[in-house]
Swiss-Prot record:
One of its GO terms (biological process) is translation. Component of the ribosome, a large ribonucleoprotein complex responsible for the synthesis of proteins in the cell. The small ribosomal subunit (SSU) binds messenger RNAs (mRNAs) and translates the encoded message by selecting cognate aminoacyl-transfer RNA (tRNA) molecules. The large subunit (LSU) contains the ribosomal catalytic site termed the peptidyl transferase center (PTC), which catalyzes the formation of peptide bonds, thereby polymerizing the amino acids delivered by tRNAs into a polypeptide chain. PROSITE patterns: RIBOSOMAL_L13E. This is Large ribosomal subunit protein eL13. InterPro entries: Ribosomal_eL13 (IPR001380), Ribosomal_eL13_CS (IPR018256). It comes from Dictyostelium discoideum (Social amoeba). Component of the 60S large ribosomal subunit (LSU). Belongs to the eukaryotic ribosomal protein eL13 family. Gene3D superfamilies: 1.20.5.110. The gene is rpl13. The keyword Ribosomal protein applies. It is found in: Cytoplasm.
Length: 209
């Protein structure tokens, strides 16, 4: 079978192809096996969460940047703003990605707050129960600790608020094209250097005259 968005080829079946049809009769059993593996993993890592904390990121390119999704890991800048180091963050269930870079203040603020919320709910078990260090949980907090059995969601991290009451759109809003505006802004940003250079050449020629 071809991969990606390509034309499906005309298959010429020969050599008893009916005996080579791929089947998935083990699908129900695999579902049970995955469920049992999740239960075993939760028991093995108890009391830690079954998944690491991931940042909220936007997909690359104009096609996908309208939607948010879970990223690979938090940037060093986000960890620093939350008062954490990369080495320590990995030990308390926080994913770290040293390659990703914050390009907007919005993403930095959002993920920093996500880290702080995680830390506020985090219960660090002390190595020595009778002598807990600063930041580690007491005996009472350890007794009340609950394991998180679901991955940390991304959608819940962004609060959707409506500041305006419902109203009818104006004629200007109906004619407004968000895609065309973004496309024009993107094109303008790409050609800003070329247009500046052309303007300088034109001004220099005008000065010579």
């Amino acid at each position: 079978m071809p991969i990606h968005n390509k034309v499906l080829s005309n298959d010429h079946f020969r050599k008893h192809w009916q005996m080579r049809v791929r089947t998935w009769f083990n699908q129900p059993a695999r579902k049970i096996r995955r469920r049992n593996n999740r239960i075993e993993k939760a028991a093995k890592v108890f009391p830690r969460p079954i998944a690491t904390l991931k940042p909220v990121v936007r997909g690359s390119t104009i096609r996908y940047n309208m939607k948010v999704r879970a990223g690979r890991g938090f940037t060093l800048e986000e960890l620093k703003a939350a008062g954490l180091t990369a080495q320590y963050a990995r030990t308390i269930g926080i994913a770290v990605d040293t390659r990703r870079v914050n390009k907007t203040q919005q993403s930095l603020t959002l993920n920093t707050q996500r880290l702080k919320n995680y830390q506020s709910k985090l219960v660090l078990f002390p190595r020595k129960v009778n002598a807990p260090k600063k930041g580690e949980a007491t005996k009472e907090e350890v007794a009340k600790a609950v394991q998180t059995l679901k991955p940390f969601t991304v959608k819940s991290a962004i609060a959707v608020t409506c500041e305006q009451t419902p109203r009818k759109p104006t004629e200007a809003e109906k004619k407004f094209s968000a895609y065309a505006t973004l496309k024009a802004a993107d094109s303008k940003a790409k050609t800003v250097g070329i247009r500046r250079k052309a303007a300088e050449i034109k001004a220099a020629k005008a000065a010579e005259k």
